[in-house]
């Protein structure tokens, strides 16, 4: 049986989502350990997005194939009973065998938070980048418009040796300012390694007038990571939601 799992987590003390041999401190590893204990055998899950170390999630999606049918509510309760306090399962549903959380995803929504006030947001410090300066929002919005659409984002990819296509589509980059912070919402069909964090660093450089708008357009042509902006800290980034097509959602209802 195939189960879809909706997960949320505080990524502060983890080495990212993906299981690693050198450490047990990954989100995937923690969930697999609990499921394996429940089933009495080794279990592997597939995640929709491989969030980096320190990145958070409110709507990560995973799926797992179990040999025996189990009530989804029981799976959810068991996971929440034994998972660490900074990982929680919001929902477990039974889905068709062919459903794959990553391969069937049509897009993702990420949110990046930036503190711009003089006073630090002490109680939110794990989830927001303390930039401490107020950039020009109009310039940032204009730069965001340039980056929206289908482009080769190689300049915004941390993996310089990546041989696969670096072409991605960003549907929207929405910037909002509220109470001493800037919230940037990125919606796209997929994102490269550190792509959103590099995009954010680049937008901030434009907003601080350290980079021109014309240079942003050039970044899409030169395909050179060294030319793009700095990589914003991981802690400001949260995976908000994984998108699936409406037809897929209907087919998931058994």
Provide a role label for each language-model segment:
Residues 1-254:
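Structured-RNA-binding interfaces characteristic of tRNA pseudouridine synthases
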């Amino acid at each position: 049986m195939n189960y879809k799992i909706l997960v949320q987590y505080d990524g502060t003390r983890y080495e990212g989502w993906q299981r690693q041999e050198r450490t047990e401190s990954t989100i995937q590893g923690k969930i697999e350990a609990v499921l394996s204990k429940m089933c009495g055998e080794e279990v592997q899950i597939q995640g929709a997005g491989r969030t980096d170390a320190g990145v958070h999630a409110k709507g990560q999606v995973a799926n797992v194939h179990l040999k025996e049918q189990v009530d989804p509510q029981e799976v959810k309760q068991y996971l929440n009973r034994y998972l660490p306090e900074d990982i929680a399962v919001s929902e477990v549903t039974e889905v068709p065998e062919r459903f794959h959380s990553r391969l069937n995803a049509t897009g993702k929504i990420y949110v990046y938070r930036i503190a711009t006030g003089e006073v630090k947001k002490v109680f939110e410090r794990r989830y927001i980048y303390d930039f401490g300066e107020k950039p020009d929002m109009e310039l940032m919005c204009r730069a965001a418009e340039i980056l929206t659409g289908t482009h080769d984002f190689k300049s915004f990819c941390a993996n310089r040796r990546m041989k696969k296509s670096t072409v991605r589509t960003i549907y929207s980059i929405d910037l909002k300012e509220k109470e001493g912070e800037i919230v940037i919402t990125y919606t796209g069909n997929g994102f490269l390694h550190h792509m959103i964090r590099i995009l954010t660093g680049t937008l901030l450089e434009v907003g601080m007038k350290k980079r021109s708008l014309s240079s942003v357009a050039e970044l899409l042509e030169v395909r050179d990571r060294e030319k793009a902006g700095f990589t914003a800290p991981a802690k400001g980034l949260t995976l908000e939601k994984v998108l699936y097509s409406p037809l897929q959602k209907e087919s998931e209802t058994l």
